[in-house]
Amino acid sequence: MTTAFAFITFFNILSLLSVLTSAAAIHGDHNHVNVNKRHRNLAKSLHLPAPRAASEDQAAYIPDTSLHFEYPRRNFNINSNKYKKLTKLLPKIFKNANSITTHSWELGCFTETLLEVYNPSLTPFEWDDEYGFGGGKCEKLEFGEIPWNVLKIAKNSLIAYDWTGSPSSSSNGTTKSSSDLQDYLFNSTSPVPHISQALINGDGALGDPVSLVPAIWILSQFSKNHLVKLGLGGKSAEDYSWALGNQLDYLFSGPKAPTNNTISQREASFELWADMMYMIPPSLSYLGLSLSSEEYIKYGLEQWDGETAALLDTTVNIYRHVHDWDARLWATGNGWGVYGGIRNLYSVKASPFASTFTQQITKAESTLASVFEGLFNELDSQYLIPNYMGQDNQTLAVGDTAGTALVVAAYYRYLKICPDKVNDRLTKLAERAFDAVVAKIDKDGWVTHAVDPMGTYGWVVYPDDPDMHSPEAQAFAAKMWKARTEAGV
C-alpha cells in the first residue's frame, strides 16, 4: 500500500511539473504562426477561404512537455542517405510535433503516428490479434511495453470532457459495470445511458474528433492494466469506453447524404472534405478490426467509398478538397484521402472478414492506384506536390512538404500490400519526393515548406517563413519514414 501511494504521488508531482512547464512554454517564446501584414495582404489578394478554426475555439489541451521519444530502429537494407538522416531526426520531429499539437485532428493523427512508429502491433499495419477484443494483452503488458506517450496524450485530450452520467458517476459512488468494455460502446447494451457528445471540441467539425477513436479505445483497454491505473490515474476503463460510445452516437446522428448515408465532415451543414477520409472511415474500420465486427468494417469501407464517389475528379484522378465551395485539388487533402484508404485496407485485410469484402477491396485498391498515378504526375521541379494542383497562380502552386509526405507514406504502405499494382517509375518518383521532403527538414527537426495547417491567412505555403510550423507536417514525415521502413525500398 505504501509503495503504491508513493508511486502515485511521484506521478502526480511529475504531472504537475509538466503542466506548469507546458503552460510557461506556450505563454513564453513559442509562436509557431507568424502573423504579419505580408501574410494578410497575400491572402486578400488570393481570395482564399476562411480559416479552418478561429483561435478562440481551440481545444482545451496543453501539450505534455515531459514526453520522451526514443530513436526507432531503422531498416538496414535501405541505404538512402535521406532515409538515414530522417531516422536520426525522428526524436526531434516528434518532440516538435508534441509541442504544437493541440486540435482534435492533430491529436488523432499524432497518436496514430506514435503507434505506427513505436507500437505498430496496435495498428492495422502490423496487427496482433491478442490486442483484439477478448485477447486481454493490454492488461498483461509490463511497464516497458505500454504505449505511455499515446495513453497520456489520449487521456489529456479529454481534459474538458463532461463526465456527467458516466459509469463511475452513479449515485451510490460505485461504477456501474459490465464484464465487456464493448458493451459501453452501444446504447443498446451500455449499463448506463449514452449522452451524445464529441470526445473533444472539433471546432465545428463532426469528423475531426473521430480521429481520436483508436487512441481512446486503446486507452480504455489499457486502463484495466494495474500499472496504467497506478501510473496514469484518470478515469476508469468503463468511463473511457462509454465516452467513445457517446462519440459514435454523436457521429451517426450528424448530417448525412440522403442517397448513401455518407456522413458530413461538418456539424452544422452537410459538407464532404477530403480530410474526413482519414478521420472517419479508418476509425470505424479500426473498431471493426479490434472488436471483430463485420458491421464496423463495412461502415469504414462504405464511408470511404462514398467520399471517393463525391470528391474524386476522375478527369485527373485527384481528390477535390471540398465537394462544393473548394473544389480545387489540395495536396494535403489528397494525403488525408489516400492514407485513410490505406488504413481501411489494412484493417479489413487483417480482420476475419477479408473474403467477405473482396469486391470492395479490389475497388479501393484500383482507386488508390489511379490516384497515386495522378498525384505523382503533378510533382514540381523540386519533386514536391504543389499545394494546389492545376493552378496558374504560382503562390498557390508552391510545393507542400506536408501533403507530399503523407502521399508518399500512403504509397509505401500500398507498395507493401499491392506490389503488382505499382511500377518502378512510381516507386522512383516516390523516392524523389521522399528525398525532397527530408531536404526541407532543418537540423532542429522542423519540417519547413509546409502549408499553413490552420488556413490562418489561407491554406498557403510560406516557404520563407521559418516560424510557420505544422503539426501535420511533423507527423506526416514520421509516417513517411515508417512506411518506407516497412516497404524496405
Residue ranges and their predicted role:
Residues Y250, G254-Y286:
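Flexible, glycine-rich active-site loops centered on histidine and acidic residues
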Residues F5, N75-F94, I200-L206, E267-D275, ...:
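Short, charged N-terminal helix-start/capping segments
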Residues E271-V408, D420-D452, M468, E472, ...:
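Extended ligand-binding clefts on enzyme/binding-domain cores
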Residues H39-C109, T113-A215, L219-D239, G254, ...:
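CBM-like carbohydrate-recognition segments
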Residues I93-A97, L244, L251, E307, ...:
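A generic structural signal for nonpolar/aromatic side chains embedded in well-ordered alpha-helices
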Residues V19-L46, R52:
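N-terminal extracellular "head" region immediately following the signal peptide
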